[in-house]
Design a protein with these regions (language model features):
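Conserved, surface-exposed functional patches that form binding/active-site neighborhoods
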Residues: 96-139
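N-terminal strand-loop-strand beta-hairpin
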Residues: 1-110, 152
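Mixed-charge, glycine-accented linear interaction segment located at domain edges/termini
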Residues: 135-153
């Protein structure tokens, strides 16, 4: 499943929250997420534990750059995250763990994440879900993300 995304440091989450409210986003939820990243030869593989209640295995591939980028990913529900984490640690090794509190807003098809990450700081992320994998759709979503970057400064 493709999306267009960008993540950046955000020194003022209060201001970002006010901007999200101003443009009339839908406020979805506050989440506590612990992402365990496993060592891979290509792309990334993470186990995301959400609010100590559910978990997802998320493999993805993206080109890292300082602009909106395409990411191809899949989300697989995990029933036993402890077992999965132990098995993937044995098979691949753990690269790092990211512990964050995330506020999620929705503007049209773009998820806006306001993140407080333990030991790393505060961030904002825009994820525009693509309707298909065409170049035209990618450009359309890149434009949406670029516009939000301007709005949120």
């Amino acid at each position: 499943m493709p999306n267009i995304e960008i993540k950046a440091r955000c020194n003022d989450l209060k201001k970002a929250r006010a901007t999200a409210e101003k443009i009339q986003t839908a406020y979805l939820v506050v989440l506590h997420q612990v992402d365990t990243y496993f060592s891979t030869k290509a792309g990334r593989l993470k186990l995301r534990e959400i609010n100590d209640k559910s978990a997802q295995l998320i493999p993805y591939v993206k080109g890292y750059q300082l602009a909106p980028m395409k990411s191809d990913y899949a989300i697989m529900l995990v029933e036993n995250p402890t077992l999965v984490k132990d098995l993937f640690n044995t098979l691949l090794g753990i690269e790092f763990v990211v512990d964050k509190n995330r506020e999620v807003f929705l503007f049209e098809n773009v998820r806006i994440h306001l993140d407080e990450v333990v030991n790393l700081g505060t961030f904002i992320e825009f994820e525009a879900v693509c309707a298909d994998n065409s170049e035209q759709e990618h450009r359309k979503q890149e434009t949406k993300v670029a516009n939000l970057m301007k709005i949120f400064n």
